[in-house]
Design a protein with these regions (language model features):
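Substrate-recognition/cap helix-loop segment adjacent to the acidic, metal-dependent catalytic center
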Residues: 92-110
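Acidic, Mg2+-coordinating catalytic module of metal-dependent nucleases/exonucleases
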Residues: 91, 132-167
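Short alpha-helix plus adjacent loop in nuclease-associated cores
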Residues: 113-128
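Alpha-helical recognition domains of nuclear gene-regulatory proteins
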Residues: 20, 79, 97, 116-119, ...
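Conserved non-catalytic scaffold segment of RNase H-like nuclease domains
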Residues: 2, 10-93
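Acidic, Ser/Thr-rich intrinsically disordered and amphipathic helical segments
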Residues: 71, 75, 90-93, 97, ...
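Short coil/turn segments at secondary-structure boundaries
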Residues: 15-17, 34, 50-53, 99-100, ...
Length: 167
């Protein structure tokens, strides 16, 4: 399985700044994680600061790699081929961002932790951000490194695993 997150420029969501993902085994998901974080070089001059922090240099679960969007898309596609399913948080947006970069998720089953949380934890129509759900489920996280594509992918995987225990 593979959890992913895409960070975009806050004033133009078509500008992809980072792609992060974590690959994990279905058999032992807690023990087998490999995290990736790609910083898109041609968009490095776009900096988030109004609505979300620019945390692209705060990847804590591996080493960030700087590369073109074309190269990042190719590497992402190499890993997605082997994934049984995908995990995301509020994934409709990320799916659209990836599609704009030529990355198709068609044919892949996708679990959205935001929708899973809505179904499992509430009886209403509340929408929960990643930070809120991590906190509500007592999953340890560092708030200062959220809004980094790689970190958010890792936290999304942890959230998914916690939610599956509630089924």
């Amino acid at each position: 399985m593979m959890a992913f997150d895409v960070e975009t420029y806050e004033n133009d969501f078509s500008v992809i700044l980072e792609i992060g993902f974590v690959v994990s085994s279905l058999a032992r998901p807690e023990d087998s994680k490999e995290a990736f974080h790609f910083i898109i070089t041609e968009n490095s001059h776009f900096v988030n600061r109004e609505y979300v922090p620019d945390n692209r240099d705060k990847f804590e679960f591996g080493t960030s790699e700087r590369m073109s969007l074309k190269e990042a898309a190719a590497k992402f596609m190499q890993h997605i081929r082997d994934a049984d399913f995908l995990v995301t948080h509020s994934g409709a947006h990320d799916e659209a961002y990836l599609a704009s970069a030529g990355i198709s998720l068609e044919g892949k089953h996708m679990f959205d932790t935001q929708l899973l949380a809505l179904a499992l934890l509430t009886s209403g129509t509340a929408v929960f951000g990643l930070k809120r759900l991590l906190s509500d489920l007592a999953i340890p996280f560092d708030e200062d490194i959220l809004h980094n594509g790689g970190n958010d992918a890792v936290y999304t995987m942890k959230l998914f695993l916690a939610l599956t225990k509630k089924i």
